[in-house]
Amino acid sequence: TLYNYVGGYEDSQGLQGTCRGVYDLNTLTTDEALLPTRGGDWYDGGLWQGLFLHDWGVNNDVIAASWEYLYKVIVLSNKSIERLTELQNRKDAPAELKNYVAEVRAFRAMYYYYLLDMFGRVPLVLSSSTPMKDVNQSEREDVFKFIVNELQAALPYLNEAHSNQKGEYYGRMTRPVACFLLAKLFLNVEIYTDNDWTNGSRPCGKTYRVKIGSQTVNAWQAVQAYCDSIRGMGYQLSSRMADNFVVYNEPSEENIFTIPMDKHALQNQMQYLFRSRHYNHGKAYGLSGENGTSATIETLRTFGYDTDSVDHRFEDSFFAGTVLDPN
C-alpha cells in the first residue's frame, strides 16, 4: 500500500526513521542539531558540514534522493487515484470509494506539503502519465493553494479516527491529520505564499483571506479554527512530553500522525536512536552507536543548559554529562 512508503528500510526512503533523507534535511540544516566530524570520522566529503552551513549544490545526494522519494510516492498516489476513479465510474461502484479517493488525495497533499516546505517552487504533477516535457515549475503560492484545496476537499470524507491508535485507521490519513496539516500551512502562510523571497517583503497572515466552510477568515484565525477542530476530536497535550515517546505510545492523546513500528502491520526502520548515540554512549548502555549527532549551542541555550533554570525536558531529550552503565 501507499502507507508502506511513509516509513522505510533504506536510506532516503521514508518521511522519518531512515537516514540521508527528509529528516536529515529538516534537522541537520537548522540551528537545532549538527552531525560533527570527529577526527576523520563522518567527514564524508564535507556532506554534513555542507548541510549545516547551507553550502550544497545539485550534486548533493541527500537532497536529490529526498526529492526523488517524495515524487515517487506522489506518482504512486496519482496511480491510485486514477484506478479508484475508474472504479468509481462503474455502475456498481460502492459508495465508500469516494472516501478512499479523498484519503489518497489528502495523502498526496501531505507529500506536496513536504516538497513545498523544503523546496518552494516545485512541479505539480497530477497524472501518472505526465511526460517530462510537460513537467514545469509552479510558483510557491500556487503549490500552497493546491495543497489547501486538496485537504479541504477531502476533510468531509475522512474518518475522525486517531491515526496513532491501533485499529482500522492505524497509521492512515484521517481528519485530524488533515487538520494538523492545514494548521501548519496557515501558520506558515507568510512564507509559503511568498513567491519572491528576495525583495525584503512578504505577505501578511492577518490580511490573507481563506474560506473555511461558509466563513471567510484570516490565516491566523484559520490556524486557530483547525487547532480547535483537532482539540474537538479528542487531542490534548500530554502532561509529560516524554510520555509521547514511550515504547507503547499508541494511547497518546498528543501524537497525531505517527509511523507504526509494528512487525505485524507496517514494518519500518527507526535509526535515530542508535544514530543519536556516540559509539561510547552506545558502549556504556551495551547498545550500538554512531558518530553521534549533537545539539547546537543555540539549542543548549534555549533549554537553559548549565544554568540554574534548565528546562525539565532537557534530560528527556539529550545525552549530557557523564554517561554511565545503567547496571
Give, region by region, the residue ranges found by the protein language model.
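Short coil/turn linking the two alpha-helices of tandem helical-hairpin repeats
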Residues: 114-117, 123, 162, 188-197
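Extracellular structured ligand-interaction cores
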Residues: 99, 106, 121, 173-180, ...
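A solvent-exposed, charged loop/short amphipathic helix patch at secondary-structure junctions
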Residues: 196-213
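Elongated scaffold/linker segments in the mid-to-C-terminal portions of large proteins
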Residues: 1, 7-13, 19, 32-33, ...
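Extended, well-ordered alpha-helical scaffold segments
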Residues: 96-103, 142-150, 208-230
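Conserved, well-structured interaction surfaces
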Residues: 2-15, 36-119, 131-145, 149-167
